[in-house]
Amino acid sequence: MKSIKRYSLLALFLFLLPLSQSHGADRVTLSSTNPTAFEIDHVVAKEKGFFAKENLDVEVNYMTPDLVVKALIAGTVDIARSGSHFGLIAAARGAEIKIIGGSNYGYPYQVIGNPQFKSLNDLKGQKIAGASLASITTTIFKDVMQRRGIPPSAYTLLFVGGSPERFQAVASGQVAASLAEAPPFNFKSIEAGRKVLLNYSDEIKNLQYTAFFASNKSLAQNRSLFTRFVRAIGQGMRWVNDPANEKAAIELMVQRLKIDEGIAAQTYRFMIPENKAFRGEGIVDGAGLAEMIRLLAADNMISERKPWETFVDPAFMPTAK
């Protein structure tokens, strides 16, 4: 009799086990660049419980920008948060990936030069620090300069690397200016007496600078999972955009980005009220994506200027309900 009861209890336990496990959070792996103010959207979504509310356990794998989309294509992550250009270029070359949401909106960078330079026109005949020929920062700078009537032949680009290297090149006098600076290096430059020659936000009104990508295969298998992810991201952006959360957002930047409170406060003001870098709250910006496609086609980084809708999963179109 005891044996029958024991087996009955065991059978009941095995029957209930899958039911209890089904209530566990769905695990999602996300590739992203090393955390800066640009990545605060998914940091907030995790820290403030928005992923948890959507029953998601999101593991973030940080890597260099050029590897983020490659990890998605290789199938080692579920979602990539990447510069839109990396994903668009890959998709244009045949990668089976689609955009499912927006991350950074606009282009929160500045052109910063040494004190003797007062405007972009003053950069004619000068050396300007850039990241690389293939960098989207180079593409955007050349486009803005061309629209100002200053062709690439009028200045020399010296490719030195990322923001720290560009900052140092300007500080040493090796170059006249850096073609793109963002927090905290723009603040450090201004404090040192250097001049802001351009706020890109004055020139570029719509740009889907970064976005979230997923593979076509994964989307077909579990589109609702990605819908929950984007919804949580949107809630995170809504939280960071709320002025009532300014102090808490600054504290989160201090903790997670390992920066001091003064820089964090400057960064918050620059990214949120001034540049509204998360204004789309996860929704794909069609006009901003079209602008990115235009930039890439104009610089021969993609062969064809296709409609922006081509690159977005149908369920995540701005008008999709």
Each language-model region and where it sits:
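Short amphipathic alpha-helical segments at helix boundaries and their inter-helical linkers
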Residues: 77-82, 171-172, 270-286, 318-321
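Conserved C-terminal helix/tail region of periplasmic/extracytoplasmic solute-binding proteins
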Residues: 290-321
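Bacterial N-terminal signal peptides
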Residues: 8-18
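Secondary-structure end/capping motifs
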Residues: 220-302
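Sec/Tat signal peptide C-region and signal peptidase I cleavage site
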Residues: 19-24
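Pocket-lining segment of extracytoplasmic ligand-binding domains
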Residues: 86, 158, 165-257
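Short, glycine-/small- and polar/acidic-enriched structural segments
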Residues: 26-162, 166-172, 176-183, 196-202, ...
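Bacterial N-terminal signal peptides that target proteins for export
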Residues: 1-9
